Amino acid sequence: MSQVNMRDMLKAGVHFGHQTRYWNPKMGKYIFGARNKIHIINLEKTLPMFNEALTFVERLASGKNKILFVGTKRSAGKIVAEEAARCGSPYVDHRWLGGMLTNFKTIRQSIKRLRELEVQSEDGTFAKLTKKEALMRTRDLEKLDRSLGGIKDMGGLPDALFVIDVDHERIAITEANKLGIPVIGVVDTNSSPEGVDYIIPGNDDAIRAIQLYMGSMADAVIRGRNNVAGGTDVFVEEAPAAAAVEG
């Protein structure tokens, strides 16, 4: 099992939190101190929590379960899409649509429409339409693909969520909580860890940090799937209760 180490996290700037005036007291136990009015995250605490989350994801993937990667803010979207695609996992990189989990039946209908438009764009149907109608369908296709392209092959609800910036993706976390879907989340010093089953205290803004989180998670999914291919039986633990978060 491959583990993240302290050197990796320091190089990526995982330890740099937000300005001290924006801190969330519920993250106090993960803060080492402050430097130039910036909170410094205690990586001695982050390291085992990060590796525990990776172990959970690897075990889930070994059971052929689906992990949905969520990161819709500007600094995260591109990396989320690339790493999710690398490990063959579903993702949301543009905008979380309300009801994406709790109203998946309706979302499924939109995915069906997306697939229909994809077929029409490839089989020459668009070319037979009026210019205006073809343009409207092309715009519909682009809009649906931007919103749902990352989950069109998910097939059903995911078995876990991995979230970059839990405050930014609070709606996604709330929906997962309602459905009992475990949440793994990067939680910065200005955010609340509530509703997150596997907390990774760390910088949720720096590109290199996001690359480390996403790359490590994608690697964990790939390792888990390779375990299946190799016939390895792996026991999947239940996520610790979100209610256990102190504060």
Curated annotation (Swiss-Prot):
It comes from the Bacteria. GO terms for cellular component: cytosolic small ribosomal subunit. PROSITE patterns: RIBOSOMAL_S2_1, RIBOSOMAL_S2_2. Keywords: Ribonucleoprotein, Ribosomal protein. GO terms for molecular function: structural constituent of ribosome. InterPro entries: Ribosomal_uS2 (IPR001865), Ribosomal_uS2_bac/mit/plastid (IPR005706), Ribosomal_uS2_CS (IPR018130), Ribosomal_uS2_flav_dom_sf (IPR023591). SUPFAM superfamilies: Ribosomal protein S2. Signal peptide: none annotated. GO terms for biological process: translation. Gene3D superfamilies: Glucose-6-phosphate isomerase like protein, domain 1, Helix hairpin bin. Belongs to the universal ribosomal protein uS2 family. HAMAP family: Ribosomal_uS2_B. This is Small ribosomal subunit protein uS2. The gene is rpsB.
